[in-house]
Amino acid sequence: MSRHLISTLAIPLFSLLTLSFAAQAQAQQPIRPPIATTQVEGTDNVYIFRNGGHQAMFVVTSDGVIATDPVAYGKPTGGQDYLNEIRKLTDKPIRYLVYSHHHFDHIAGGKVFKDAGAKVLAHRIAKARLERLNDPHTVLPDEAWAMRVV
């Protein structure tokens, strides 16, 4: 084969292969992480919420719900899945939402809980870090505590 023929065929073949791979990649939708809630063995009111590889816990008390870490895979409205799972078990008010720390994967769903009436709590260091980050999508804690672990 001549060089001219090879180069003439190579460009369209390369383009066809590239378009084929691009179309295939675009056709594959991201897999939604599995959502599950399980009761902690030996308890009547403590639950673990799982959102893919993340988990949080909540406690249903006689006065309402205390939830932790609104894991939401980085979407400000992603906490709705967590709230929906709580609502499958109780219609009691969400009293408190506790951030374990300031990482976005653990706090991204805070707005949904705040809108549901929760008071948001965190350690004072987490609150200070969230204030410094100044992310408009982040719900800042209403209250912070200073606890020392010895």
Place the predicted regions along the sequence by residue.
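Active-site HxH/HxHxD metal-binding segment of metal-dependent hydrolases
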Residues: 37, 84-149
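Bacterial N-terminal signal peptides
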Residues: 8-20
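Short, solvent-exposed loop/turn segments at the edges of secondary structure
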Residues: 15, 52-54, 115, 140
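Boundary at the C-terminal end of the N-terminal hydrophobic targeting segment
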Residues: 22-27
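Positively charged n-region of N-terminal signal peptides that target proteins for export
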Residues: 1-5
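Conserved beta-strand hairpin/beta-sheet module of binuclear metal-dependent hydrolase folds
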Residues: 36-86
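Short glycine- and acidic-rich boundary segments immediately preceding or forming the N-terminal edge
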Residues: 29-32
